[in-house]
Amino acid sequence: MSRLACISSLFILCAIGSEAVFTQSAGVKGVLMCGDKPLANTKVKLYDDDTGPDLDDLLAEGTTDSLGQFLLTGHTSEVMTIDPKLNIYHDCDDGLKPCQRRVTFNIPKSFVSSGENPKTFFNIGTINMQIEFESESRDCLHR
């Protein structure tokens, strides 16, 4: 019985320790424009892109400020290195079409940090969202 208790305790300690070891974070910042005007109050979300039946983990969300600027940071615990991505939901040059344009940018793994706070931020720079991105889609859920 004591052998089983030792093995169980060791398993629990390993499980608790693995959470701290594999906590990872990412951060992204940038400026969104619509032509020559800042794209203010635009929804931006930072996800860990998971494959398979596992849903993507929302790490952070926010909106751009009056100058079109945003900064997001988030963290999660995973066994493997996280795959951060930025989703932008906007109506720049969209006319009267329903829902919003959704554009996704994958963040390089070199910007993933261990721990809850990112050591570096991925700076996407200034992007004119008038561009029609090849991979963009429409989204009616994330206003």
Swiss-Prot record:
Expressed in head cells next to and anterior of the first pharyngeal bulb, the pharynx, and the hypodermis. The gene is ttr-33. It is found in: Secreted. It holds the Pfam family TTR-52. The lineage of its organism: Eukaryota, Metazoa, Ecdysozoa, Nematoda, Chromadorea. Belongs to the nematode transthyretin-like family. This is Transthyretin-like protein 33. GO terms for cellular component: cell surface; extracellular region. Residues 1-20 form the signal peptide. Keywords: Secreted, Signal. Its main location: secreted. Protects dopaminergic neurons from degeneration caused by oxidative stress.
